[in-house]
Amino acid sequence: MLVNYQVTLFCTTGQYRPVASIVSYEQEDASVDLSKNKEKRAPIIQKGIEKICAKRYWKGTVLKKYGYTKCKIRKVEE
């Protein structure tokens, strides 16, 4: 079952606004929230970073340059 997660990147210096993206992730049990499990949230975060970079024409190295080193994910209810 596909579950939607919102991936948000924050600038640690506070100079830039947060950027976010919605990512669909295939999951067996939709009632389980993967945002708490550190191992299982890594592919969700990676997909979100790739989608944000593609949307803004950035490379992955630019994220660190702009200070986007803090990440949060949350489950999006439909």
Where are these regions (language model features)?
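Short, surface-exposed loop and linker segments with low hydrophobicity and enrichment for Pro/Ser/Thr
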Residues: M1-N4, K40
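A short beta-strand micro-motif
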Residues: V3-T12
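N-terminal functional modules and adjacent low-complexity/disordered segments of proteins
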Residues: N4-Y5, D29, Y57-T61
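Generic low-complexity segments that are intrinsically disordered, proline-rich and/or Lys/Arg-biased
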Residues: V7, V19, E28, I44-K47
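Short, low-complexity, intrinsically disordered N-terminal modules
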Residues: F10, S31-S35, Q46, K59
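A structural detector for beta-sheet-dominated domains
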Residues: F10, Y25, S35, R74-V76
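A short, exposed loop/beta-hairpin motif centered on an aromatic-Gly-Thr core
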Residues: Y16-K38
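Short, mixed-charge low-complexity intrinsically disordered segments
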Residues: K40-E78
